[in-house]
Every structure is written in structure tokens, then in C-alpha cells.
């Protein structure tokens, strides 16, 4: 099991998205109150997008000072910037285009046809450099200590674009290019476990019965090379936020909190 992971189960995907949104707002407000700014790493996927839409629709959305927030992505599809496959595009449509973010603090990963000359390795290196430039001495590493790092969960246990037994699962750099990805599109850029584990809090968010086996394996002692989600651990806190379907295969003895 991911060391110290907390498991919270909500009734269905809709309630899960709203609960994640409420947690995001509360955590960002608390971080800004304590240190003036905050940082958030976004994920793609259906439940990730639903959570961002729920943030936008929340009555408390303006409690966050969006101009004092650094926004990152855990992974990105290396396609044209206007492609519907881009996690960035989905996040902008769901939330970022509807709140007053500071464009200089929105750190999108590179895209095909952009300044990296269609080279995902160059895009990965440039993102790693950007991460390092934003790290402070008190972060004790080449990556900022993110307040929240959101991750989806693949049915085979992948997080970000780190797939089981893939080169990215063994990567020691903070950001890596991914080629021949088993899930389209095949070329991507991803934060590695080195970067993920630098976050203060890592939240794995999953809905649907097709995620149940992956959640069970990750929370029952699987290795992070075989089940990358097992290595998604925050420095201070690791949260697994699931709907009942995604939690349906968890072992009976696993501690969890269930909402009505």
C-alpha cells in the first residue's frame, strides 16, 4: 500500500468531482493564507476535467486568489496546441479561461509544432528547466514543493503518462518524453515519480469500475514499476479519492472513509 495513504470514497462520480473541487479550493486558500501563494498540478481525464468544472461552478471559487497561483501539468499529449487531445486545452475550457489567472504563472508543457521543433525530449528538458527555476532553496530539490498534485488513474495502474514497466517508470530525471505509449496519442511528456513525490500532497482521483483493480493493486503493496500508481506518494499527505465503483475491489481490511 502507498505509505500513509488516506482513502476517501464518495457515492458516485458526480459527487466525487464536487468533493474534489471543494478540497482544492480549501487547500489553495489555506496555502495562500499561510505563505502568500500556492501551486497546483493538474491532470487530464474525465474526472479531472469534471473536478475543474466543479471548481468553476462552486460559490467559493473566488475565495482563491487565482493570480497568486502557479499552475502546472503532470503530463501532456505531444500534439498541436489546439488539439482536443491536449490536457491544457481541456483545463482552460473547464476552469482556467473562467478565472483571473496570471498568464505568467500558467506553465503549459510543450506541444508539437511549438518552440521545441517537434522534439518531445526537448519539450521535457525545457519543462524540467522551468520547474527547477521555480524551486526555492527550502524545497530541497529541482522541483517546487507543490501544494496539490492531482493524478488520474489508468485501468492498468498508470498515473500521468507513466505506464507499467515503461522507460518513464525507471526515469531518474524530473520530466521525460514518452514514445509508443500504449494509449493514444502515442507521444507525450510526463513528470516522473521524482517530480510527483516532491509534492506536499498527492491526490489520486478515480471513478468507475474499470479502475477498481488498479486501485486495489496500488493500495495493496504492488511495486511502482508494475503499478506506477503505487509510487504516487506525497511528502506530507497522499489521498486516494474514489467513487464507490472504483473502490469496489479494495480489500475489506483497508481503512477508508465513506461519504453518504
Language-model regions, residue ranges each:
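N-terminal glycine-/serine-/threonine-rich phosphate-binding loop
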Residues: 1-40, 121
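Ligand-binding beta-strand-loop-alpha-helix segment within the catalytic cores
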Residues: 2-4, 64-147
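Glycine-rich N-terminal segment of FAD-binding domains in flavoprotein oxidoreductases
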Residues: 29-59
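Glycine-rich beta-strand-to-loop/alpha-helix junction loops that act as flexible
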Residues: 42-47, 151-155, 207
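A glycine- and small-aliphatic-rich helix-loop capping segment at beta-alpha/alpha-beta transitions
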Residues: 54-65, 89, 93, 164-173
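Short, conserved loop/helix-junction motifs that constitute active-site signature segments
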Residues: 60-70, 99-101, 168-169, 194-199, ...
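Class I SAM-dependent methyltransferase SAM-binding "motif I" and its flanking Rossmann-like core
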Residues: 148-194
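ATP/nucleoside-binding phosphotransfer catalytic cores, i.e., glycine-rich phosphate-binding loops
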Residues: 194, 200-260
Amino acid at each position: 500500500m502507498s505509505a500513509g495513504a488516506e482513502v476517501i470514497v464518495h457515492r458516485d462520480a458526480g459527487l466525487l468531482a464536487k468533493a474534489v473541487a471543494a478540497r482544492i479550493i480549501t487547500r489553495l486558500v489555506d496555502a495562500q493564507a499561510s505563505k502568500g501563494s500556492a501551486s497546483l498540478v493538474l491532470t487530464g481525464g474525465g474526472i479531472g476535467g469534471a473536478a475543474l468544472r466543479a471548481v468553476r461552478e462552486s460559490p467559493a471559487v473566488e475565495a482563491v486568489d487565482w493570480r497568486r497561483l502557479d499552475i502546472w501539468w503532470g503530463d501532456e499529449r505531444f500534439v498541436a496546441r489546439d488539439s482536443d487531445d491536449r490536457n491544457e486545452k481541456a483545463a482552460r475550457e473547464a476552469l482556467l479561461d473562467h478565472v483571473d489567472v496570471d498568464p505568467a504563472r500558467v506553465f503549459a508543457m510543450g506541444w508539437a509544432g511549438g518552440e521545441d521543433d517537434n522534439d518531445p525530449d526537448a519539450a521535457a528538458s525545457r519543462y524540467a528547466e522551468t520547474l527547477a527555476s521555480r524551486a526555492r532553496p527550502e524545497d530541497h530539490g529541482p522541483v517546487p514543493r507543490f501544494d496539490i498534485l492531482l493524478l488520474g488513474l489508468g485501468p492498468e495502474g498508470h498515473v500521468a503518462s507513466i505506464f507499467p514497466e515503461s522507460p518513464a517508470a525507471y526515469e531518474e530525471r524530473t520530466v521525460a518524453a514518452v514514445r509508443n505509449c500504449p494509449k493514444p496519442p502515442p507521444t507525450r511528456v510526463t513528470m516522473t515519480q521524482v517530480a510527483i513525490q516532491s509534492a506536499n500532497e498527492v491526490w489520486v482521483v478515480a471513478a468507475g469500475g474499470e479502475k477498481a483493480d488498479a486501485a486495489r493493486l496500488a493500495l495493496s503493496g504492488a511495486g511502482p514499476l508494475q503499478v506506477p500508481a503505487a509510487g504516487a506518494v506525497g511528502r506530507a499527505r497522499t489521498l486516494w479519492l474514489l467513487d464507490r465503483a472504483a473502490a469496489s475491489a479494495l480489500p475489506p481490511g483497508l481503512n477508508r472513509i465513506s461519504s453518504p
